[in-house]
Swiss-Prot record:
It comes from Shewanella woodyi (strain ATCC 51908 / MS32). Its EC number is 1.3.2.-. The ArdAB flavocytochrome c is composed of a FAD-containing subunit (ArdA) and a heme c-containing subunit (ArdB). Heme c 4 binds at residues 83, 104, 107-108. Induction: Part of the ard operon, which is induced under anaerobic conditions. Expression is further induced by acrylate and methacrylate. Not induced under aerobic conditions. Heme c 2 binds at residues 29, 54, 57-58. Optimum pH is 7.5. Its main location: periplasm. The keyword Transcription does not apply. Its cofactor is heme c. One of its GO terms (molecular function) is metal ion binding. Binds 4 heme c groups per subunit. Residues 1-22 form the signal peptide. This is Acrylate reductase cytochrome subunit.
Amino acid sequence: MKMYKLMLGLVLAGLVSLSAQAIEQRDYHKEVIGKDCKSCHDQGVKNYPSDQACLQCHDVDELAEETARSEEDKWQNPHNNLHYGKELPCIECHGEHEAKKPICSNCHTFKYDKHKE
């Protein structure tokens, strides 16, 4: 019985520890920390946010301007690129609770030094 209680205690302690670590948030979203999860998770807390949720705070035209490159590399802009224009879903490159690589890196080798995972 003592062994059972010990094992149960260890399992419960592990679960509490995991749940505390499970919700990771990026520093650049400090202003939304503490708000209701539904402010971003507009399709339910178990689903990814829609682009409309991201666009409540972020403007795609401003992002495209901020990430613009020189003329010869202008289509290497993650927010206005040759393949998707400005239509690529935000979650393809960005994740709030876990790091993500830009979708471009699946085929291309150019880097985005300021990429926020």
